[in-house]
From Swiss-Prot:
The chain crosses the membrane at residues 3-23, 63-83, 97-117, 131-151, 156-176, 198-218. One of its GO terms (biological process) is phospholipid biosynthetic process. Belongs to the PlsY family. The keyword Lipid biosynthesis applies. Its EC number is 2.3.1.275. This is Glycerol-3-phosphate acyltransferase.
Amino acid sequence: MNILYSILINLALFLLGYLLLGSFNTSIILSRRVKNDDIREHNSKNAGATNSLRTYGAKFALIVFATDVLKTLLPILIISAIVNHVPAVNAFSYASYISPQALGLGVVIGHIFPAYYKFKGGKGAACTVGLIISINIILFLIAFLIFLLVVGISKIVSLGSITVAFSLLLFVWMPWMIQGPTGYWTNAVEYTNSFTTLVNYWYVSPIIYTLCAFLVLVSHRDNFKRLINKSERKFAIKKAV
């Protein structure tokens, strides 16, 4: 029964993330509300921060990026806090089987395949950043440095995103990275008593990240083709319109 309840609870979190958070695509909503436009009709036709940067400028893109990161990170932290600090939930016998990052997976998938926009959304990179921070802040710092290095040299944002998605797979599967002190947010079981049962399931977060990384890489398939053909666009900022 533990396995069944665990699956049902985490499936509910996944659907919550997919339908109520991920499927509300930030760049589509803002482009329609603020610009009376649709971001998906411009440049790469992608509903994400990079295309927002090219189409509407840095300020618009920063808002999109920050919102996409936070719409993944904050709900994960809220679920974690509820499970750990609300007595009624904490006393629930299956609370220790809840993986808050199941919600994050739903957000990433919803962002890429939004239910309310004909399943045509972004590439999931910014939302995955929120997931990364929730797993371990050190992973985010590693990702940030790799991204800066790659984009600084190549001037190609997509190459930076692709490299980060691949590179973090080397780190996220280290058990100490998941449940060590710097994994405090949702994984450090010595600090989050409700998740002590998950100590034997440390690989849950790496599996969730691996799924997200795979989706991010698949969503960059056209970028792969342009990189191979050496026709990928380099970094450029459009003035706000």
